[in-house]
Regions:
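N-terminal, polar/Ser/Thr-rich
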Residues: 20-44, 502-503, 507
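Solvent-exposed beta-hairpin/edge-strand motifs
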Residues: 63-113, 201, 551-553
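Extended, low-hydrophobicity, Ser/Thr/Pro/Gly-biased non-transmembrane segments
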Residues: 85-100, 114, 123-124, 128-135, ...
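Beta-strand-rich binding/interaction modules
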Residues: 209-210, 501-502, 515-518, 522-586
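Hydrophobic alpha-helical and helix-loop surface patches within well-folded domains
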Residues: 229, 260-536
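Outer-membrane beta-barrel initiation region
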Residues: 546, 556-563, 571-578, 585-680, ...
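Short loop/turn motifs that connect adjacent beta-strands in outer-membrane beta-barrel proteins
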Residues: 617-623, 641-643, 676-685, 697, ...
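C-terminal outer-membrane beta-barrel translocator/porin domains of Gram-negative envelope proteins
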Residues: 730-737, 743-873, 877-880, 884-885, ...
Length: 935
């Protein structure tokens, strides 16, 4: 069958002897003639490459990247169960195989296959490069023609790219051998632009959506359809999406053909995407230069998730964003989708249109795409107030979403807040750095996207918005279709703006500088014609000019620029009205590590039920301490640094129907919580729950604890060339009090643990707990251990083993500190005691369904359904004061676990189970329900 497809693929070739309409003459040209074979999950065929030597020196070989071989082997550093999440039936390889290389006359050429050095990843390094030996040296700017016969395989996977999932094939870059500079051997990831054209043959039941200026359906012969794909300008690839279930809607903008391809039930999003896309293209084109494509398609990707990906002439959108568009509220993710489309469309200018080294200098791609998209979003939806979910209408669900997520601001909480967390965790380092040299791989995404955007925003503040936009337009004119490096962009911007940017680039791109400006105080004195105010300022970190804005008593403002050349200084403001407050960097243009001290006086905002309906939303700004008051309690916090809350409600444990209200609500329940993140290795938390608290009599049940959490990181191998930091060991020190007031017993607990989840799927924890004598209980101490291990029997088939053991070290434990087997489902009253042994084994079967997407009342969707069976049991004994039968109890059961969609990509696991007692007194078969996070 494969041979017959290859024959039919040639039927239309006579009509397309020349597929180039306006391709540049100084770039290489690719003429691809390929066929999709769904049986083998491969694209097979040939490429005729008219190669131009643009290296500036004579060469005797051509280097081709075989990108498909990056996925030829599984990652040996990850436990196989982690890999299962990416694949349909366990690991499935991608690869590109070379069948032969010939010259322009059809004569065989010598070639070799080379491995890669571990510059991007540390596994699957074999066969990365095809090296074609030239019969004689090729002079600079000269051409040579070679034809490569190849076959590339799609993985059966949910890896977003280079895969086939549910009959839809997706591959953006490098499905064909790509000629690359020889320097790539030493690192970097470059995709030179070339004049690409192709004929693609597929079974007639498949539809093709390719990123090409023109896609023409030629004819169908013997059940096979051939498409012609051409481009008017050099591109970096012809991205492909091929599937049986895809449909499309079309539109146009300024003569550019727009398409949106969607899977079943995705039409509403497709039409919305076309509407957004027209607005986005108009904005980007007007401000950042001409779009270099004649056709653009948006495609719903088959893999779930809230993500977007771009390639030449194509934007892919994760299926979850499409399918959850109106769930659980109408238009729930419309703003998020608009931003994502703006980001991916920006790549048609930066990253794809203007190329870069996607390894060391990916800032030019992702940082610039963030700058274009967030600038667009803020000009349309505002930049300082909540703006991601404020478009939702009234309603019960909508109001709940507003309470939980209504504060979100795109820039503040999706860019600045992650950057601040990066600083707190100590994962910052230069933006421009190859993967293999990264000291903190954990921070790579935040540095490239979030910090990268903030650096461009600061650059705009430094040179001016008009100058930066002029530089971006000029870069689009001069570098589209080429590879732009950071130094060339710096030189271009300096020329346009007339500003020396060496220090700025050294601080923020080649270095890991930070910045913080603070208003220490101000003094106002009366002058002859008004008032004179001296503002005292302080700066740490990089030198950046700062706007200082003062608000006057009459509501007007005055501003002045502080150049911040010294670490401390002052400026003088003249005004006709007294100054009441001062704000440094009021438009939040600079990557400030602490915006709270940008105000004088400091901002403390109070949200309460009696605020005017016309008052602006307070949200959760990064420059203010926010306190919220509700009928049941009070809460507050600052950024992600710390949060606290206090909630008090009447205790309903008594007779709620009593005639005397005092009898019904004679006590209260109080919950207090506090959490603070200090740095990568240290955090603190405190919780206190007082149940049936009678303040007058000093009675009630109390469970309170204050914990110091410490983490020790290691650098396990992850398959990436960079250094990854994982919290392998932890130590928690807890001071608490537990029991009935006034005799509640204070205690201290030391817990240590180790996680080897990445390579072994193994976790262990030990804890020692000791009561503090003299407060109503005797002295005692306990020790306990718990562990978990997952064994992979086959793809998606697991054997989970968990165990617990606890015993006293000395003394007699009180009831509040005794053990009981609370995981048992078939025993209503398992015994208490100061000794316990407990174990559980689970057999987790492959999912009955996966990524089902079954809606439930338009509130959520069932994604996965997993069946499992378990046996668990143990014994608790010694010093019992409550339920005291100390025999062994064992039960068996089965569960169906439904994984449902949460909010913003989070999931919940709801398990419905049935347990049967096997051994022990008082057992009774029972149905149970559990809610947890998916493992």
């Amino acid at each position: 069958m494969r041979r017959s497809w290859g024959v039919n693929a040639l039927v239309a070739l006579a009509a397309i002897a020349s597929t180039w309409t306006a391709a540049a003459n100084d770039v290489s040209q690719y003429d691809l003639r390929v066929t999709l074979d769904p049986t083998e999950q491969t694209i097979v065929g040939s490429e005729r490459v008219d190669y131009v030597n643009d290296s500036g020196r004579a060469i005797d070989e051509i280097l081709f990247l075989l990108y498909g071989n990056a996925g030829a082997e599984p990652n040996p550093d990850l436990h196989p169960a982690h890999l299962d999440a990416q694949y349909v039936h366990g690991f499935d390889p991608t690869w590109t195989r070379i069948r032969g290389v010939t010259d322009a006359d059809g004569r065989a050429m010598e070639y070799d296959i080379e491995s890669s050095s571990p510059t991007l990843q540390t596994y699957s390094l074999e066969d990365w490069f095809l090296v074609v030996a030239l019969p004689e040296p090729l002079a600079p700017d000269e051409r040579v023609t070679v034809t490569v016969e190849f076959e590339t395989r799609f993985a059966s996977a949910i890896t977003l790219d280079n895969c086939v999932y549910r009959g839809t094939y997706v591959w953006r870059f490098g499905w064909n051998p790509v000629a690359v500079p020889p320097s790539i051997r030493d690192g970097g990831f470059l995709l030179p632009a070339a004049a690409y054209g192709a004929t693609l043959t597929v079974p007639e039941e498949y539809r093709v959506f390719a990123g090409a200026d023109r896609q023409t359906k030629l004819d169908t012969v013997a059940g096979l359809t051939t498409y012609e794909l051409t481009n008017e300008h050099p591109v970096r690839s012809i991205p492909l999406v091929i599937g049986r279930d895809l449909e499309a809607v079309t539109a146009s903008w300024e003569g550019i053909d727009l398409e949106a391809a969607y899977l079943p039930s995705g039409e509403a999003f497709a039409r919305l995407a076309l509407s957004y896309l027209a607005e986005i293209l108009a904005y980007h084109s007007e401000r950042f230069g001409t779009l270099g494509y004649r056709r653009l398609i948006v495609v719903e990707a088959p893999a779930p998730g809230f993500y977007g990906m771009a390639a030449d002439g194509m934007i892919l959108v994760g299926r979850s964003l499409v399918q959850l568009k109106d769930m659980p509220a109408l238009g729930m993710y419309d703003r998020l989708a608009e931003y994502l489309l703006a980001h991916e469309a920006a790549h048609l200018w930066w990253g794809i249109g203007i190329g870069t080294d996607f390894d060391a200098e990916n800032w030019i791609s992702e940082g610039f795409a963030e700058y274009l998209s967030i600038t667009y979003f803020e000009e349309k939806h505002g930049g300082s107030e909540p703006n991601l979910f404020t478009h939702l209408g009234p309603g019960l669900v909508e109001d709940l979403i507003g309470i939980e997520l209504g504060y979100l601001n795109l820039r503040q909480h999706l860019s600045e807040s992650p950057y601040l967390d990066l600083l707190r965790l100590g994962f910052d380092e230069p933006i421009v750095r190859p993967t293999a040299e990264l000291e903190y791989l954990n921070g790579q995404t935040v540095r490239t996207y979030s910090k990268g955007y903030l650096v461009l925003r600061a650059l705009e503040s430094l040179v001016g918005r008009d100058a930066l936009r002029d530089a971006l337009v000029r870069a689009n004119e001069e570098w589209r279709g080429r590879i732009l490096d950071v130094e060339s962009f710096r030189a271009l911007t300096e020329e346009v703006a007339g500003v020396d940017l060496a220090a700025f680039f050294n601080d923020w791109l080649y270095g890991a500088e930070t910045f913080d400006v603070a208003v220490d105080r101000f003094e106002t004195v009366a002058a002859d014609d008004g008032y004179e105010t001296t503002v005292h300022l302080r700066r740490t970190g990089a030198v950046l000019p700062v706007e200082v804005r003062a608000t006057l008593a009459d509501g007007s403002t005055v501003s002045r620029l502080w150049h911040a050349g010294t670490s401390a200084g002052s400026i003088v403001l003249d005004s006709t009205s007294p100054v009441v407050r001062v704000h440094a960097d009021p438009d939040e243009m600079l990557p400030d590590a602490n915006r709270f001290d940008n105000h004088w006086p400091r901002q403390i905002l109070v949200n309460h039920p009696f605020r005017s309906e016309d008052a602006p939303d307070i949200g959760r700004p990064l420059d203010a301490y926010v306190i919220s008051i509700s009928p049941t309690g009070i809460s507050g916090g600052f950024r992600n640094d710390h949060q606290w809350s206090l909630v008090a409600m009447p205790h309903l444990g008594g007779d709620a129907f009593a005639a005397d209200i005092a009898d019904a609500f004679g006590a209260i329940d109080v919950v207090v919580a506090f959490a603070a993140n200090i740095d990568r290795s240290l955090s603190v938390s405190a919780t206190a729950m007082a149940t049936a608290l009678d303040v007058a009599n000093g009675t009630g049940d109390l469970d309170a604890q204050f914990t110091l959490h410490t983490r020790r990181f290691s650098n396990p191998e992850t398959g990436s060339a960079g250094t990854y930091w994982y919290p392998t060991q932890w130590l928690d020190l807890t001071f608490g009090v537990r029991g009935e007031l006034p005799q509640a017993a204070p205690y201290v607990e030391l817990a240590v643990g180790r996680s080897d989840a990445i390579p072994l799927y193994l976790e262990n924890a030990f804890a020692v707990r000791a009561a503090i004598p003299g407060f109503g209980s005797g002295s005692f101490a306990t020790i306990e251990w718990s562990g978990f291990k997952r064994f992979r029997l086959a793809p998606h088939l697991y054997f989970d083993l968990s165990a617990f053991a606890g015993a006293p070290l000395f003394g007699r434990t009180t009831t509040e500190f005794q053990y009981w087997m609370d995981r048992l489902e078939a025993f209503a009253l398992p015994p208490y005691g100061d000794h316990q042994l407990f174990g559980r084994v689970d057999l987790v079967l492959p999912p009955l369904v996966r990524n089902l997407g079954y809606p439930i009342l338009n509130l959520t969707r069932i994604e996965d359904v997993v069946a499992s069976a378990f046996v668990q049991g143990g014994r608790t004994w010694g010093s019992c004061t409550l339920v005291c039968e100390s025999g062994i109890r064992v039960e068996a059961g089965a569960m169906l676990t439904f994984v449902v969609d949460g909010v913003l990509g989070g999931n919940l696991a709801i398990s419905l189970g049935y347990a049967v007692p096997l051994l022990g007194l008082d057992g009774e078969s029972s149905v149970f329900l559990e809610v947890s996070l998916p493992r």
